[in-house]
């Protein structure tokens, strides 16, 4: 049984992940917008785990220039928007992450009515996800 609000857990994950990336020389920011009374449960934990996957991918494939992660609560859903530039050496920015972690999350999330979209345009990686909040 979880007794932590989802918003508190997400904010802690964003702050911790920003600190970790900043310590490794990355520039960027994360923010949480909106309000939710949802509590952390096994489904909502997937949101937190997906955020950790996103930060791992930033660390692996992103240029150390500006990154952005924005999490927004809205109408029984959570939206995640993430952008960064890919490292010059990591031209495979899209293919590496998609085959493993993101594809697993995409299947889980689409099974509950959400979706993940991502693309690489030139050197810019963009990611968008909508996850329903389940109680």
Go through the PLM ranges and name each one.
Residues 24-52:
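Conserved short strand/loop->alpha-helix "switch" segment adjacent to the catalytic nucleotide/phosphoryl-transfer site
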Residues 54-62:
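Short helix-loop "hinge" at the ATP-lid/N-box region of the Bergerat-fold HATPase_c
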Residues 66-77, 83-84, 122:
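Short beta-strand/loop element within the Bergerat-fold HATPase_c
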Residues 85-87, 132-135:
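Two-component histidine kinase transmitter core
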Residues 123-134:
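Short C-terminal beta-strand
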């Amino acid at each position: 049984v979880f007794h932590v609000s989802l918003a508190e857990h997400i904010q802690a994950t964003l702050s911790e992940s920003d600190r970790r990336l900043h310590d490794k020389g990355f520039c960027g920011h994360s923010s949480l917008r909106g309000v939710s009374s949802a509590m952390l449960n096994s489904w909502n934990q997937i949101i937190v785990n997906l955020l950790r996957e996103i930060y791992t991918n930033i660390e692996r494939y992103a240029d150390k220039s500006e990154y952005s992660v924005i999490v927004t609560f809205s109408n029984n859903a959570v939206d995640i928007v993430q952008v960064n530039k890919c490292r010059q050496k990591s031209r495979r920015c899209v293919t590496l992450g998609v085959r493993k972690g993101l594809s697993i999350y995409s299947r889980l999330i689409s099974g509950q009515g959400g979706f993940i979209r991502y693309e690489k345009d030139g050197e810019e990686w963009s990611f968008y996800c909508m996850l329903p909040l389940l109680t």
